[in-house]
Amino acid sequence: MYGQVDEWVGAQKFPGGKTAVQVSGGGMSTSYWGLKGAEDLGNGYKAIFTLEGFFRAQNGQYGRFTGDTTFSRNAYVGIESPYGTVTAGRLTTHLFVSTILFNPFIDSYVFSPMVYHVYLGLGTFPTYSTDQGVTGDSGWNNAVQYQSPNFNGLSASAMYALGNTTQNGAKKWSGQVLYFHGPFAATAVYQYVNFNNSPGDLGSFDSSGVPGLKAQSVAQLGVSYDLKYVKLFGQYMYTHNDQTLTSWHVNTAQGGVSVPFGPGTVMASYAYSRDGGGFDQTRQTAAVGYDYPLSRRTDIYAAYLYDHISNQSSGNTYGVGLRAKF
């Protein structure tokens, strides 16, 4: 068994809302636990499986939110071979991998500006509405994926998620190329989601908040370069949405740095999104934080995030947290 527990204490104010002081989970990373295994089949082949589920340590409940499934992080079986790996089940999407690898706050749903713009940017939230983000979850149900072997740092993968229905709803596909070479890394991702008003992948966030939304295509590029004294991050994303009567697009960019400072790391990131043909909104989000390792598996952190959507009051989030891996 393996996983991590992340808890933070602080205050959060979404754009257009009021400040709430809270003890909550997943400040820097969402808490989860997992099981995995492999069986050697001979001749370079292995049978593999992974089961991973999120939980909320602040109240002892499973899932990221009420209604989330038990193994919403990953749940799959597969075959590894010299020719690549094939897996089937609920799989982490290529876009999520690209999003978290090329921003300094990685997968934080509390302090990462890029995660805000990608996964908290489409729909009606408690205090604001926006049409700029990506539909669906960080994982796809009913999915099949092929991942190539690594060729001198270069790898590619393709995924298709069946809708398990006679209609077009929830059918999705994506492809990704990743490259790692010394201090340099890069990625390119494309994903397409075709659905009937609701993508069916994110429980309480199921509704897109945009009536008549039929399909969405997303392309994202990411790069990073580690200069030792500073690591640079950059991302660009183009999102195209097809609605029943019209369409609109969104341009998103993110730049960030992580700087070693003492035994820990200073992180800073800024993301900007602007849409055309939809709500005609602009969104600017910036964050700064410091992560301090207490041991190889435990760290503490402090961070602040500023979030502004045009024509709404700004949001602010700040807090300190503890993360322990096991």
Locate predicted features.
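Outer-membrane beta-barrel "beta-signal"
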Residues: 314-326
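Outer-membrane beta-barrel architecture
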Residues: 34-36, 76-78, 145-147, 176-178, ...
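Detector for outer-membrane/organellar transmembrane beta-barrel domains
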Residues: 174-287
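Repeated loop/turn-to-beta-strand initiation elements of outer-membrane beta-barrel proteins
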Residues: 45-47, 83-87, 153-156, 183-188, ...
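Gram-negative outer-membrane beta-barrel proteins
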Residues: 9-17, 55-61, 94-98, 164-168, ...
